[in-house]
């Protein structure tokens, strides 16, 4: 598969192998530059499903949508690109299907979580401690709250809680104290390089600095974009949008995301057999999901060498085994 110049798709072969099984509506809820969407469309074409299928690509980043429109130009008749958040997957699917006279049920949904390589490499987005830029970190540039707002307004206790909760940072209190001291003595934390210097000053061990920087920047990014709340909403509504035997594939990159995804999938796969000792022959409620992958799929060494971002990626896939369900509106 030809690589996208904007975003190198992670685990693309596994995604298409487990997701593209029949014609229908496919949703890439985290479109990015269109790398995974292109892989899905090519898989549909190879299987002879393309003319009876539609791909809906969702992203809140205008630059990503522009890049994806170029990547998917060959398939413009069978793709619809929508600016939005993947937590709105139900309403977006409903609107697109209503416009086209289609039943609003998806054969497959993909969520590739985290920040794209392009966003990390663009200094002006403020996602990376390796790039000198503003403390922004907004996925959607139309949203109001930036990382600078959080760093410069939260008190020490709130900052420490944030870094520990979303970054699992063991030195969260020390880092928060250094940030507040800097604000009191110097003024506002104005950019990524200033924040990185404060963090390095709090964590003097050079062998630990990179992981500490990564955890703090991750925590801020999650808070700015409300990523975990958005993920929970997207998982819940996404499952409701699946057709019978439709599948959802989710790629996560850190333990907080993966725990949420795993917990949700496992819980939705369980059947309710009522109180212990009753000995019911049929469950009160059957699980709505089947676990296609009992354990997460990971990249092999070849892919990791070609695309280091794949090293931390975990792919989980489930299938809707419930014949009923609510349609998207």
From Swiss-Prot:
Pfam families: Methyltransf_5. It is found in: Cytoplasm. It catalyses: cytidine(1402) in 16S rRNA + S-adenosyl-L-methionine = N(4)-methylcytidine(1402) in 16S rRNA + S-adenosyl-L-homocysteine + H(+). The keyword Methyltransferase applies. GO terms for molecular function: rRNA (cytosine-N4-)-methyltransferase activity. Its EC number is 2.1.1.199. S-adenosyl-L-methionine binds at residues 34-36, 59, 86, 112, 119. GO terms for cellular component: cytoplasm. It is an enzyme of class 2 (transferase). InterPro entries: RsmH, SAM-dep_MeTrfase_MraW_recog, SAM-dependent_MTases_sf. The keyword Transferase applies. Coiled coil: none annotated. GO terms for biological process: rRNA base methylation. Keywords: Cytoplasm, Methyltransferase, rRNA processing, S-adenosyl-L-methionine, Transferase. Belongs to the methyltransferase superfamily. RsmH family. NCBIfam families: 16S rRNA (cytosine(1402)-N(4))-methyltransferase RsmH. Specifically methylates the N4 position of cytidine in position 1402 (C1402) of 16S rRNA. PANTHER family: 12S RRNA N4-METHYLCYTIDINE METHYLTRANSFERASE (PTHR11265:SF0), S-ADENOSYL-METHYLTRANSFERASE MRAW (PTHR11265). This is Ribosomal RNA small subunit methyltransferase H. It comes from Chlorobium phaeobacteroides (strain DSM 266 / SMG 266 / 2430).
